[in-house]
Amino acid sequence: MAELTHVDHCAFGPLYDADSEVLVLGSIPSPKSREMKFYYGHPQNRFWRVMATVLAETLPESIEEKSTMMRRHHIALWDTLSECDIVGASDASIRNPVPTDIEGLLKKTKITRIFCTGASSYKYYEKYQYPRTGIHAVKLSSTSPANCAVSFERLVSEYQQIIANNS
C-alpha cells in the first residue's frame, strides 16, 4: 500500500493580479505540478488545452506563456488546500487538509466568480472557504488524466462558463 506524503503548497503561490475577476481552483498540486512549480503540470492533464480552446488562444507551452494567457483574461489560479497528507495525486486519499486563504486573495483582486476543477476541490472550497467568502463555487469536471471518461469536448463546453460575462 502506498504511503501518505505531507504536501505543503509553499513551492508556488496563487497566480493572480489586481485585475483578476475569476478564480479557478484545484485541490492541491499533483507531484508533477510540484516538481514543475506550476499548476496542471502533468503532461496528460487537459487543463491547458481546454483553457486555450475556451479562450481562443494558441496552446501555451512555457509557464510564462500560461501565466500571461490567464492574466490577459483576468483569470486567477490557486488551490483550495495549502497542505495535506496525500498518496500520490489521489484526491480520494487526502487526510489532514488545511485550507488556503482565499478570503485574503479576494481582498486583493476583483474576483467575484469561483470555479473548482473537480469534486475534491469543490468539496474543500464549500466546506472551508465558502463560509468565509459567501461566494458559491461552480463545480467543473476535472481535467486530470484520471478523469479520462469525460471527453475533451465536454470539458470545453463546461469550462466555457469561466468566460461567460467576463470582461
Q: Locations of the language-model features?
A:
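Short, well-ordered alpha-helical microsegments
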Residues: 121-125
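C-terminal capping/extension of enzyme domains
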Residues: 1-21, 43, 88-103, 126-167
